[in-house]
A protein has these predicted regions:
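N-terminal basic/disordered segments at the start of proteins
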Residues: 11-20
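Alpha-helix N-cap and loop-to-helix initiation/capping positions
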Residues: 17, 42-50, 125-132, 208-216
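A short, Lys/Arg-enriched amphipathic alpha-helix followed by its capping loop at the start of a domain
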Residues: 24-30, 58
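Residue-level signal for inorganic ion chemistry
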Residues: 25, 88, 199, 217
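Short loop/turn motifs at secondary-structure junctions
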Residues: 29, 84, 145, 192-193
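Conserved anion-binding
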Residues: 34-43, 55-184
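C-terminal helical cap(s) of enzyme catalytic domains, especially alpha/beta-barrels
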Residues: 48-58, 99-102, 189, 200, ...
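A generic "structured core" feature
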Residues: 111, 175, 195-198, 205, ...
């Protein structure tokens, strides 16, 4: 699964947890869908067995992604090796050693999430200059050995955007997350030209995936891709 520039921009809908979510995602037809696995604090949490059951009805055209937060390496590898998921997305404090140990199990496609610095961190001159904070962060993201990086405002699924101009520091393809949805997705694509977009809470109503919002979000990205040709 090679990573090239997002042409067309790829689409990932994340946080599926119910059979009806699978019905909706099959209708919307994004490129990827995400399952949050073994993260009890998430309202979208699923168990490996739940994902296996949901996966059976997922369209083969949609690539399933497992989203993890500091999960034991062997558990992630097991789900990749048995085909439950095809991509591992790391959303915790996983480091280069973690990625190295995961790759020892096989040739896997790995996405590593990075939290974009908040204004208070950037302006905290007591520790580092704003320029140093940004350069250190960008250097870490650019040097990640993951196949793809994801930029978010925090732990994922918060529905809040980050300062988009900071993404200009990244010199590699990236997946854009954090408050991206039907209402602002065209603006985000025009400004940042990401490899792909990752949406979760923005395609929900009352904490549940919303079929109409999922269809609208995917439709707007497809339209943007078509107009870009």
């Amino acid at each position: 699964m090679a990573v090239m520039s997002g042409n067309p921009v790829k689409i990932k809908l994340c946080g599926l947890s119910r059979p009806v979510d699978i019905d909706s995602v099959n209708e919307a037809k994004p490129d990827y869908c995400g399952f949050i696995i073994n993260v009890p604090k998430s309202i979208r949490n699923t168990t490996p067995d739940q994902v296996r059951a949901l996966r059976k009805n997922l369209s083969p055209e949609i690539i399933p992604v497992g989203v993890f937060r500091n999960e034991p390496v062997e558990n992630v590898a097991e789900l990749l090796l048995d085909g439950t998921i095809q991509v591992a997305q790391l959303h915790g404090s996983e480091d280069e050693d973690y990625i190295r140990r995961l790759r020892a199990y096989g040739t896997f496609f790995i996405i590593q999430a990075f939290r974009v610095p908040i204004p208070e961190e950037i302006s905290d001159i007591r520790t580092r200059s704003p320029e140093k904070v940004l350069s250190d962060w960008a250097d870490m993201v650019n040097k990640s050995s993951a196949d793809l990086v994801l930029l978010d405002n925090g732990g994922g699924g918060t529905g809040k955007t980050f300062e988009w101009t900071l993404a200009n520091q990244i010199q590699r393809p990236f997946l854009l997350a954090g408050g991206i949805g039907p209402d602002n997705i065209t603006e985000a694509l025009d400004q940042l030209h990401p490899w792909g977009v990752d949406m979760s809470s923005s395609v929900e109503t009352d904490g549940k995936k919303d079929r109409k919002k999922m269809l609208a979000a995917v439709s707007r990205v497809r339209a943007w891709n078509k107009n870009r040709r």
